[in-house]
Design a protein with these regions (language model features):
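Glycine-rich ThDP/TPP pyrophosphate-binding loop and its adjacent helix/strand module
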Residues: 1-93, 283-387
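Thiamine diphosphate
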Residues: 14, 89, 93-313, 318, ...
Length: 387
């Protein structure tokens, strides 16, 4: 691995990972170098105990004898939760440094206009702007009038063109699939070496790295990250998606090409079990909108969430508009709602999500012709319905 980084032109330091002097020197040396740096720390698992360099050291250090012998080697007190004096002193110095920087920041913040202070506070409290709901409703109304047949990935791009200029804290991106995921709105510029103000990140083919970095942004606060890839590739992002749920952060995962209707890529790209495992993940909202109206509503709910990540599953293929009558209420926030009521005595209820909703409506028409009263329920989010 070390030679691999060297061959790529990186600045590489190989050090004893247990030597604080070497660690400090390597960090200082890396800071002075204008190349990307990799510090390779050679270490021993369970250093200082009888379990050193064995598999036992991976999970057995809660053993009292091992703890006592390790502390003895280090010269530490046998008291529980003992913090060595030199370590405590170092942390106290770091705290003083942080306090100085914090006070300086607070003075700068106090000089801002009340409007900027309020907007900053809004972003960090994860409140959506008051104007967002009205803008989304205008979009929904236009869709109900025009009734386009578009893929929901395109619908997502359309509503992002409404959302992103209003919510300037959003940071978008894609794992090398921007043109397919439709995650870049027209107002966004790319974040790169020459443009640090860009709000769109080309992550490359790094789904897990993208998801992990988005989680970091969400944990920092003040930013609302979202990123896209194919639904099938949730496999690669799964660890970070799961951690987002565990950490209760509202990262938004845009997963397009959500069914066998994805096109010519074939079985390797066809999601089969992926929707089920996303829905099975606790504290995760999975949206599968049926048209542009539901897509807009899904985004609205996802952005209003403060402690739950969202998966927005979108189609490659075009879908007809099924919500033809405009309603200002966000019906998708209920999780499910009656899209078409049965005519006559109700005998059948068809429940569907995403691209299957229009199929359910077609089936309803046929059943009604045969005299079977059929209701169609659209269920864009099972988790919200179950609440």
């Amino acid at each position: 691995q070390v030679e691999r980084f060297k061959s790529a032109g990186w600045h590489v330091c190989e050090i004893d990972g247990h030597n604080p002097v070497e660690i400090n020197q390597a960090i200082l040396e890396s800071k002075r170098n204008n190349k990307p740096s990799m510090i390779a720390c050679k270490t021993h698992i369970a250093l200082g105990s009888s379990a050193q360099d064995t598999s036992k050291g991976h999970g057995a250090l809660t053993d009292r004898v091992l703890i006592e012998e390790t502390k003895k080697v280090y010269g530490w007190s046998q008291k529980n939760f003992h913090v060595p004096t030199e370590v405590k002193k170092e942390w106290e110095e770091i705290g003083k440094k942080g306090q100085k920087e914090r006070l300086s920041w607070e003075r700068d913040f106090a000089l801002l206009s009340l409007k900027k202070q309020s907007e900053f506070s809004r972003m960090y409290s994860m409140e959506v702007p008051k104007t967002l709901g009205r803008a989304i409703n205008r979009f929904k109304k236009s869709i109900s009038l025009e009734q386009p047949k578009v893929a929901t990935r395109k619908s997502s791009e359309m509503i992002l063109n409404v959302i992103n200029p209003i919510m300037t804290e959003t940071v978008g991106g894609s794992a090398d699939l921007s043109g397919s995921n439709n995650t870049k709105s027209s107002d966004m510029t790319v974040f790169d070496v020459d443009n640090r103000k860009g709000r769109y990140i080309h992550w490359g083919v790094r789904e897990h790295g993208m998801a992990a970095a988005m989680n970091g942004m969400a944990l920092h606060g003040g930013l609302r990250p979202y990123g896209g890839t194919f639904m099938c590739f949730t496999d690669y992002a799964r660890p970070s998606m799961r951690l987002a749920a565990l950490m209760q952060i509202p990262t938004i995962f845009v997963m397009t090409h959500d069914s066998i209707g994805l096109g010519e890529d074939g079985p390797t790209h066809q999601p089969v079990e992926h929707l089920a495992i996303s829905r099975a993940t606790p504290n995760t909202l999975v949206f599968r909108p049926a048209d542009s109206v539901e897509t807009a509503e899904a985004w609205e709910v996802a952005l209003q969430s403060k402690n739950t990540p969202s998966v927005v599953a979108l189609t490659r293929q075009g879908l007809p508009t099924v919500r033809k009558k405009y309603k200002s209420a966000n019906l998708s926030s209920q999780g499910a709602y009656i899209l078409e009521e049965a005519e006559g005595k109700r005998e059948v209820i068809l429940i569907a999500s995403g691209s299957e909703v229009s199929l359910a409506l077609t089936a309803r028409d046929q059943l009604q012709k045969e005299g079977t009263g059929t209701r169609v329920v659209s269920m864009p989010c099972m988790e919200l319905f179950e609440k």
